[in-house]
Amino acid sequence: MKTLVSILVLLFLLAACSQVVTETSAPTMTTQKPELAATPTEETDPYEQERQVLIEEIKAMGVKDEAVLRVMDSVPRHEFVLSEYLGQAYENHPLPIGYGQTISQPYIVAWMTELLELEAGEKVLEIGTGSGYQAAVLAELGTVEVYTIEIVPELAELATTRLEKLGYTDIYVKQGDGYYGWPEYAPFDAIIVTAAPDHLPAPLVEQLSEDGRLVIPIGPQGWVQTLWKFVMVEGELKGYNLGGVQFVPFTGPGAEEHQGEGTAIP
C-alpha cells in the first residue's frame, strides 16, 4: 500500500513540474504580421500651380532676370500674408498686413529687386520691412547680409519671428525710423525703399557705396508717385525716372521733420 501511495505522489510531483516549465517558457509566436504605421509621403505643394501662373504673369510684365524669377518662385509668399488672405497669396496685387501697411504686389517686388542688380556678396539695406517678404527675396539672391528697418514695432517683431522660423539667418531686422538709414553698417551696395517719402532722404544717399544702387518711390501721398533708380558714380548721384507707382506713405519723425527737403533729384 505504501508503495502505491509513493508512486502516486511521485506522479503528481512530475505533473506539477511539467506545468511549471510550460508556464515559464517563451510565449507562442504568432504568424500574423503586426500592422505597420503608414509611411508619410511628401505632400504636394498646394500653391505650386498658382505660383507658376504668377511667375508667368511677372515675366509677361517685363521681368527678365532668371535669378529673380527663380527666387520669386521659391520664396513662400503665403507664409508672409495674414491667414484671411491665404487664398490670395499668389495673386498679383498687394495685400493688407495690418497697422495700415501692405505686402507689395509680387510684380513690384520682382521689378524693384531686378533694378538693384544684386551680386553675391553685396550688402543690402531695406527701408520698410513690413511682413519680411521683400527681405526674404533679397536674401535668397545670395547677398551676404540684408539689413532691414521697420518703424512699426509690432510688424518688426512679427517679421523677425517669421524670418527666424523660415531659417533666414542673414537678415537683420531693426525697429526704428528708416529715414536715417543704418549708419553703423554703412556703406551699402544697394538700398531699397518700400514706402514713399515726398523727397529723396539725404541720409540714404550718404550711406550708398561707390557704384551703389538706390531704388525708391518718391512723391506726394494719395497720388501716383514716381519710382526712381539712383546710381552713385564717382561720387555723384545719377537718377533714372522709371514711371508711376503707388506705395504706402513713408512715416516717422524723420520724414515729417524734413518734409519737402532732402537731396535734389539729379
PLM regions: where:
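C-terminal motif of bacterial Sec signal peptides marking the signal peptidase cleavage site
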Residues: 13-16
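Conserved nucleotide-cofactor-binding alpha/beta core module
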Residues: 117-238, 265
